[in-house]
C-alpha cells in the first residue's frame, strides 16, 4: 500500500471514530437539558401547588375564621346576669333568656341582626355595664303567667292597705261581702230560699255543704268516733257536743 493510500485510510478511520463521540456528546447534552427542564417544571408545579394551597388556606380562613374564645370569656365573665334578667325595657320588667349559641363567633354573625333590633344599649348603660353585641336577649311573652301571679298576690293583700274590698252589699240589711257568691247565699236568708233539697227526707238547705253533711244521717257511716266511749257520730259538731258529757263543761 502506498503512503497516500495509508493516509487516506487513517483520515477515514479518524473521521469514523470521531462521529460517535460527537453524537454521544450531543446526546449527553440533550439529556442534561431534559433533566433541567424537568427540574424547572417540577419547581414551577411545586410553586404553583404551594400558591394554590396558600390561596385555598387563606380563602378558607377568610370564610371560617378561627374563634377567639378568650375575648368572649372575658366579656361574659364580668356580666351580672341576675341584674340583666331584671332589667327594665321601655319602663316594664321583661325577662331576657340567653341563647348559648350566640356566645360563639360563627353563630354570632347569624344573630347579629337580632341584637340590633331587640336590644337597647342605653338600658345596659343604666346598669353600669357596657354590653357588647354578642349579647342576644330573646324576649319571651310571659304576661299571662305574670298576670296570674299578680292576681294571686292581690288576693292576699291586707285590707287595711287596699281599703274596703267588700264591695258587694246586701240591699236589705246593707251587709257587705268580698265575694258575689257569698252575697247570693246571704240573700237566701231574707228570701227564705233553700234550693238544695235532700232526696231522702225532703229537707232543704241554703248551702250545698249543709246538704252534704245532712246526707250522712241517712247512712250508717259515722266517721266521728269518741275516744273515751267509742260512740260514733256522723257529724263533727255532734261529737263535740258529746265530748262535753265527759268533761262536764
From Swiss-Prot:
InterPro entries: Znf_C2H2_sf, Znf_C2H2_type. It is found in: Nucleus. Keywords: Metal-binding, Neurogenesis, Nucleus, Repeat, Zinc, Zinc-finger. Residues 20-65 are annotated as: Disordered. Disruption phenotype: RNAi-mediated knockdown results in defective formation of the distal end of the two M2 pharyngeal motor neurons. The keyword Nucleus applies. GO terms for cellular component: nucleus. In larva and adult, expressed in the M3 pharyngeal motor neurons, extrapharyngeal neurons in the head, the PQR tail neurons, rectal cells, vulva cells, the spermetheca-uterine valve, body wall muscle cells and neurons of the ventral nerve cord. In the embryo, expressed in pharyngeal cells, extrapharyngeal head neurons and within the tail. Expressed in body wall muscle cells during late embryonic stages. Expressed in the mother cells of the M2 and M3 pharyngeal motor neurons precursor cells at the embryonic bean stage and subsequently in the M2 and M3 cells as they are born. A zinc finger (C2H2-type) spans 168-190, 196-218, 224-246. One of its GO terms (molecular function) is zinc ion binding. Residues 24-52 have a biased composition (Acidic residues). One of its GO terms (biological process) is positive regulation of axon guidance. Required in the M3 pharyngeal motor neuron to guide the growth cone of the sister M2 motor neuron during axon development. This is Zinc finger protein mnm-2. It comes from Caenorhabditis elegans.
Amino acid at each position: 500500500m502506498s503512503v497516500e493510500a495509508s493516509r487516506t485510510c487513517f483520515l477515514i478511520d479518524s473521521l469514523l471514530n470521531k462521529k460517535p463521540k460527537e453524537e454521544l456528546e450531543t446526546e449527553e447534552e440533550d439529556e442534561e437539558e431534559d433533566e433541567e427542564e424537568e427540574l424547572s417544571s417540577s419547581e414551577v408545579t411545586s410553586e404553583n401547588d404551594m400558591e394554590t394551597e396558600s390561596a385555598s388556606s387563606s380563602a378558607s380562613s377568610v370564610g371560617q375564621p378561627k374563634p377567639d374564645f378568650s375575648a368572649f370569656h372575658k366579656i361574659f365573665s364580668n356580666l351580672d346576669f341576675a341584674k340583666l334578667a331584671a332589667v327594665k325595657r321601655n319602663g316594664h320588667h321583661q325577662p331576657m333568656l340567653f341563647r348559648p349559641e350566640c356566645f360563639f363567633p360563627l353563630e354570632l354573625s347569624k344573630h347579629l341582626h337580632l341584637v340590633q333590633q331587640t336590644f337597647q344599649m342605653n338600658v345596659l348603660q343604666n346598669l353600669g355595664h357596657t354590653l357588647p353585641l354578642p349579647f342576644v336577649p330573646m324576649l319571651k311573652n310571659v304576661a299571662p303567667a305574670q298576670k296570674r301571679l299578680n292576681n294571686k298576690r292581690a288576693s292576699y293583700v291586707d285590707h287595711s292597705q287596699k281599703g274596703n274590698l267588700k264591695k258587694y252589699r246586701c240591699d236589705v240589711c246593707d251587709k257587705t261581702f268580698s265575694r258575689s257568691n257569698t252575697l247570693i247565699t246571704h240573700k237566701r236568708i231574707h228570701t227564705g230560699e233553700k234550693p238544695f233539697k235532700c232526696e231522702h227526707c225532703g229537707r232543704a238547705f241554703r248551702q250545698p255543704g249543709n246538704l252534704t253533711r245532712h246526707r250522712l244521717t241517712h247512712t250508717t257511716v259515722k266517721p266521728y268516733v269518741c275516744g273515751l266511749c267509742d260512740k260514733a257520730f256522723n257529724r263533727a259538731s255532734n261529737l263535740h257536743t258529746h265530748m262535753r258529757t265527759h268533761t262536764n263543761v
